[in-house]
């Protein structure tokens, strides 16, 4: 699409730019003093937030108005704040969007600490399939709270799991019945996972992508949380050498579609003979493993079992656990953050517009929120790639099947741009 040349928007003097060391400085001061500093910038090639030099400073004169944004964040006072002209481009999960097109409740991308190792993320995935849960942070802060809870008889198992998350701040409490609960500090990196799993009907939803991400550690935690094992034979006789038994895992807390997806995943990915059936007077849905599938599954998860849970293994698979906590240094990553408020900022003494040009990536962060390196003047011609507006965000959330045949998709559609805007 053809367009005329355009000068992108700017920031109010007091908007604070995030510097390379994590501190902030007012953009007006950076520009007026032509400060030779590095700022944090997102590198799309490496998918990392990196330090970059400022290579140009701009004071673009008075603005008619600024929009004041308040965005949720996990640390400090729980809020990021900045003021931008309505045409300044701000990064959202759907792409670059003009500030004037954003409303309260929309989400932008912000830099937040990323604390979990790959192993710890698997602990979360497995626990969500079992007794763990993620609850939203109710104080208008970014991040969700991961919680684990087990009865008194499983206290040792809970301690084992908590040790795997040992570098994450947490509190432990016990109720009158002796059950213990561990609440971890809210983690922004789990917010999208919480939105994907809890669809609003009270049951947990696990997509095909979720199941494909599971490692044997996650499967082991799911089994230890919700699985039962009935030992049929200890293997003392020659015909039952090695022992035999059957696994049953309760899946009542999952949506009906998820139960079928999980059964098919175990069959197709791991070659396990499993079926769904109702059990007990309450008619709860369980996944039942054949004796051959039980042995195959237990061999897969044995190296990842907690010592206190090895009674759920055949005798020949016990004593194989090799799990040790794996922690990583915190890094800054992009996560969606909700806009808590946006309004026209009252006129101040300085209404001048300020901006900077950043080496290479052409973006920077204002109080943690990603914005475009705006003073890039274009001369017309073809519309820039990032300037194309996405109006509907369509995501597949479930494949509908008739037996084994895929017959359709269940999709979630979100209007991500609802005003007339270029192009």
UniProtKB/Swiss-Prot annotation:
Pfam families per record: LAGLIDADG_2, RecA
Domain of life of the source: Bacteria
PROSITE patterns documented for this protein: INTEIN_C_TER, INTEIN_N_TER, RECA_1, RECA_3
Any one cellular-component term (Gene Ontology): cytosol
Modification after translation, per record: This protein undergoes a protein self splicing that involves a post-translational excision of the intervening region (intein) followed by peptide ligation.
GO molecular function, one term: endonuclease activity
Matching Gene3D superfamilies: Hedgehog/Intein (Hint) domain (2.170.16.10), Homing endonucleases (3.10.28.10), P-loop containing nucleotide triphosphate hydrolases (3.40.50.300)
Entry keyword set: ATP-binding, Autocatalytic cleavage, Cytoplasm, DNA damage, DNA recombination, DNA repair, DNA-binding, Nucleotide-binding, Protein splicing, SOS response
Coiled-coil residue windows: none
UniProt record, GO biological process: DNA recombination; DNA repair; intein-mediated protein splicing; SOS response
Subcellular locations according to the entry: Cytoplasm
CDD domains in the cross-refs: Hint
Protein family according to the UniProt entry: Belongs to the RecA family.
Known function: Can catalyze the hydrolysis of ATP in the presence of single-stranded DNA, the ATP-dependent uptake of single-stranded DNA by duplex DNA, and the ATP-dependent hybridization of homologous single-stranded DNAs. It interacts with LexA causing its activation and leading to its autocatalytic cleavage.
Protein name: Protein RecA
Organism: Mycobacterium shimoidei
């Amino acid at each position: 699409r053809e367009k005329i040349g355009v000068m992108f928007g700017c920031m109010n003097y007091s908007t604070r730019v995030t510097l390379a060391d994590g501190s902030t400085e007012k953009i007006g001061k950076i520009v007026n003093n032509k400060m030779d500093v590095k700022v944090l910038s997102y590198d799309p090639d490496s998918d990392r937030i990196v330090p970059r030099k400022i290579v140009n400073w701009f004071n673009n004169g008075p603005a008619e108005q600024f929009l004041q944004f308040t965005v949720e964040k996990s640390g400090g006072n729980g809020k990021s704040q900045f003021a931008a002209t309505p045409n300044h481009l701000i990064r959202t999960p759907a792409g670059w969007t003009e500030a004037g097109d954003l409303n309260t409740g929309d989400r932008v991308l912000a830099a937040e600490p990323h604390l979990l190792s790959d192993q710890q993320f698997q602990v979360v995935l497995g626990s969500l399939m079992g007794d763990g849960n993620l609850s939203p942070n109710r104080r208008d802060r970014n991040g969700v709270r991961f919680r684990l809870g087990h009865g008194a008889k499983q206290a040792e198992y809970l301690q084992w799991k908590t040790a795997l998350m040992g570098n994450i701040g947490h509190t432990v409490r016990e109720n009158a019945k002796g059950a213990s609960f561990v609440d971890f500090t809210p983690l922004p990196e789990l917010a999208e996972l919480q939105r994907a799993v809890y669809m609003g009907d009270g049951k947990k939803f696990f997509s095909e992508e979720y199941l494909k991400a599971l490692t044997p550690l996650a499967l082991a935690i799911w089994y230890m949380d919700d699985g039962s094992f009935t030992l049929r034979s200890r293997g003392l006789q020659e015909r039952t050498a090695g022992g035999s038994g059957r696994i049953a895992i309760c899946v009542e807390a999952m949506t009906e579609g998820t139960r079928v997806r999980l059964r098919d995943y175990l069959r197709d990915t791991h070659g396990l003979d499993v079926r769904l059936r109702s059990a007990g007077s309450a008619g709860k849905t369980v996944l039942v493993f054949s004796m051959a599938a039980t042995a195959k599954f237990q061999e897969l998860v044995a190296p990842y079992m907690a010592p206190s849970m090895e009674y759920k293994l055949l005798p020949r698979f016990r004593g194989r656990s090799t799990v040790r906590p794996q922690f990583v240094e915190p890094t800054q990553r992009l996560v969606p953050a909700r806009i808590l408020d946006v309004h026209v900022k009252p006129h101040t003494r300085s209404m001048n517009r300020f901006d900077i040009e950043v080496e290479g990536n052409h973006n920077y962060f204002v109080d943690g929120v990603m914005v475009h390196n705006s003073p890039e003047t274009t001369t017309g011609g073809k519309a820039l790639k990032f300037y194309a507006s996405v109006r509907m965000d369509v995501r597949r959330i479930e494949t509908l099947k008739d037996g084994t045949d895929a017959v359709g998709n269940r999709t979630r559609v979100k209007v991500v741009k609802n005003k007339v805007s270029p192009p």
